[in-house]
Amino acid sequence: MADRKFNFCAGPSALPTEVLLQAQAELLDWRGKGLSIMEMSHRSDDFVAVAVEAERDFRELMSVPDNYKVLFVQGGAATQFASVPLNLLKLGAEADYIDTGIWSKKAIAEAGRYLKVNVAASAKDNGYACIPARSEWRLSESAGYVHYTPNETIGGVEFLDIPDVGDKPLVADMSSTILSRPVDISRFGVIYAGAQKNIGPAGLTLVIVREDLLGYASDSLPTMLNYKVASENDSMVNTPPTFSWYLAGLVFKWLKGKGGVQAMEAINCRKADKLYSYIDDSEFYANPIDLSCRSWMNVPFTLKDDRLDQKFLQEAEGAGLLNLQGHRSVGGMRASLYNALPEEAVDALIGFMQDFAGRNA
């Protein structure tokens, strides 16, 4: 579509144009039923079929083992900062958390309201530019689980491997990396992910939880946050965000049509490599993150003169490159390269950056 621009927003992020066109075509009359899917009962046979198919496709894409439940819940990933410790409280009154940036710090602060948090490793001392080596972690023997954030969207720091935490359940906030590459789900106890990066629109959160962890919830856990209750009710304890669930299902179909997460891994690696290579070769732009832990999904960068920041953003928008401003807490620029952002968007961004640098060096 000629009027579609390239959206580099960190979230809510770009959605596949093909998905939006299908949703548009079905908006008023879903598959000849005479009503929108937004108007349909979540307990109707038609919507239940949509929900079941979405879960089946997600399981196939992520190779989710049979002994894991997939939950479609509400509240965003931030709600999971409380849900995780409350659902796992009876594993132990202490948990290990790895601090690699703003989102892991938020998870630490919230969990600290319900149990003792041991910050087993922190990137604070290196300015959150590098993930602490596994040999530096100080895991607690009494911890019930270990939590980490594989990708920090604001700082642009990412774990490129799954950390080994022994027999402790590993919990991960995969909001910004889910579906971007294959993952060995069996290495985890719980994975959660807000939808608005690689899954679909905001309003939905996916939780993957190993079945044997469903019986460890706090007795005071609110019903709507209880993984076991959600599992027993097929994620429909109350009315779910049906439109977000439906759109997520369309995204899963789109991903399968593109070759699945294996194909996305190659594309995403290529997109990130292109942009980092240009930044590293440039004397006008810089990326502060250590080479060993640069994010594929979120690429922060600065200009050599920050007085040019607003000019850069204004001209980029005029060139059809949207939402490149860095997070308000760190400034600078940030290009988010989620699945739905095509490779030509990265090529267009690099072309603009070259032109801007040439005119403002």
From Swiss-Prot:
Tell me which Gene Ontology terms the entry assigns under biological process: L-serine biosynthetic process; pyridoxine biosynthetic process
Residues binding pyridoxal 5'-phosphate are: W103, T153, D173, Q196, N238, T239
Enzyme Commission number(s): 2.6.1.52
Function comment: Catalyzes the reversible conversion of 3-phosphohydroxypyruvate to phosphoserine and of 3-hydroxy-2-oxo-4-phosphonooxybutanoate to phosphohydroxythreonine.
Indicate what this protein is called per its UniProt record.
Phosphoserine aminotransferase
GO MF terms here are:
O-phospho-L-serine:2-oxoglutarate aminotransferase activity; pyridoxal phosphate binding
Broad class of where this protein is predominantly found: cytoplasm
Query: Which keywords fit this entry according to its UniProt record?
Result: Amino-acid biosynthesis, Aminotransferase, Cytoplasm, Pyridoxal phosphate, Pyridoxine biosynthesis, Serine biosynthesis, Transferase
Q: Cofactors per UniProt?
A: pyridoxal 5'-phosphate
| Cofactor note (record) | Binds 1 pyridoxal phosphate per subunit.
Residues the record lists as N6-(pyridoxal phosphate)lysine modifications:
K197
Tell me the superkingdom of the source.
Bacteria
Subunit structure, briefly?
Answer: Homodimer.
Reaction equations catalysed: O-phospho-L-serine + 2-oxoglutarate = 3-phosphooxypyruvate + L-glutamate; 4-(phosphooxy)-L-threonine + 2-oxoglutarate = (R)-3-hydroxy-2-oxo-4-phosphooxybutanoate + L-glutamate
- Annotated L-glutamate binding lies at R43
What lineage does the source organism belong to?
Answer: Bacteria, Pseudomonadati, Pseudomonadota, Gammaproteobacteria, Oceanospirillales
What's a GO cellular component annotated to this UniProt protein? cytoplasm
| Top EC class of this enzyme | transferase
| Subcellular localization | Cytoplasm
- Metabolic or biological pathway, per its Swiss-Prot or TrEMBL entry: Amino-acid biosynthesis; L-serine biosynthesis; L-serine from 3-phospho-D-glycerate: step 2/3; Cofactor biosynthesis; pyridoxine 5'-phosphate biosynthesis; pyridoxine 5'-phosphate from D-erythrose 4-phosphate: step 3/5
Family, as annotated: Belongs to the class-V pyridoxal-phosphate-dependent aminotransferase family. SerC subfamily.
